[in-house]
């Protein structure tokens, strides 16, 4: 038998059952003796069960036999705990694992590290069993495996905890996504504007509130809310091609600018594309002109929201869901209370084009050019214009201008005139129908002639009805989509204009940087001339004159994007500035200020150049390519519908007049 030092401090050898029962306990402990005497009666009552346990333990190895003996010692002869066997074992397992945690056996750790993955998985899934087995082998073989069991249990616990944390993180992420992005079914649903209610604000003011239905929820918004939404999107996504919204027009002057003040078109029973105006109801008393304006806005605003819900980049932010959330009753209050929207720069040209919410200090200090800076001039071509020629943006700009002109001044304009002409022809046919009916009633004696006149009256009346249906289809399903395409081309033009203004911004920085460098060079020359004698002063003055001319030339070059008036004004301003700045100033202080300004301009120039490259790449390779593909599909659909409507009208009209001819031949 091995020398076993028990937890009471004695080091006697365990030889037989008597030594186990008597000699293991430390001498001189009266309480322990009392406990042993009190436990003798209990041990005698359970003698049969102990003998059965010993017989079963003898079948196993000697190590297992020793462990069983020691378990019986702990269960029967422990003087400190008055508990049953099972509760004592669990308490013993916890205390042993806690006490021996600091004792580490390198060989045991090495074996544990080289163990199979299956054993680790079993340990992680059943930590209680591993602890019990570890304690049994520890009491028998020297106490090394109990550390292994506790370590395995800790590793299994850590693994389970890590899995639990991962599951918790996944659950939190899923909840965050669900709080930001609604159900997938809602994303696939299309927006519909079901009602348009005329609401009075008091003092003779009124506005139209549009009831938007999306999935199972509905919210009411007015036109100014859509306008505010688009302005925020332009700041958040400056490089995206945003769909247009209808122009800001009053209820009085809209009809004059679209189709005349007296036109009233029949609403078609079939809708095309994503907008079906039949589903929209206008509540309240409105005139014909107001009805056209409201239906025009319903179509444009519905298409606006549906296109936003199809944009993957915009869907990454919750702004569209916030707009459609019925809990946000007042949209302006929601925008004003948001810290993200309030921190955005006022000008898009001072935003970070890739992430406007992460605008740096350098972006906020960039100059903001006006539209007058991009006016054409006959002066020298600047560096940014050569960049545009290399990138091909000058050709792209001309092509989109031509495309917008063909749509607006060509297809859309002439089709609107045709619609108005057909609308006038419709009223002429109704007048002819009334005239023939009047003649038929006047021919009382001529029954045959009266019957023919009645047929003609009915024919013109039916033709007027068919033409009225055609005019309604052309107006709502052809002219309105064409007008939307024209405004979409205007959005592409705005995107190209944004890129061009960023180029002008870079040009301003380059010219300002060159001007500051020349001013610094001039001051350095003046500072080097001052301590010298008068013989070199004349040469230095000549150099000064040449150096003075360079900033003026650069200033004239910097104003190459302006007109003649701006050039002269800039020259006068530069002369006044030089007389003020360079009169009785400390050259050293001025040079220090110029050096700081040059460093800031260098940083701004690098940022502006990098932004221009990113914007050019995104617009040219992604935005305009998608724009061309989408416009091609829309125009194909419009032309197919156009030919279908004209074909159906011609077929109905032909059948009508064939029937009139047949009746006349029968007479």
From Swiss-Prot:
Free-text comment about domains: The PX domain binds phosphatidylinositol 3-phosphate which is necessary for peripheral membrane localization of ATG20 to the perivacuolar punctate structures.
SMART domains per the UniProt record, alphabetical: PX
PANTHER family with a match to the protein in the record: AUTOPHAGY-RELATED PROTEIN 20 (PTHR46979:SF1), SORTING NEXIN-41 (PTHR46979)
Polar residues compositional bias, start-end: 55-67, 532-545
Residues forming coiled coils: 588-652
Protein name in the entry: Autophagy-related protein 20
Predominant place of localization: membrane
Domain spans labelled PX: 185-331
Topology in the lipid bilayer: Peripheral membrane protein
Assigned protein family: Belongs to the sorting nexin family.
Region feature Disordered, mapped onto this chain: 1-94, 524-562
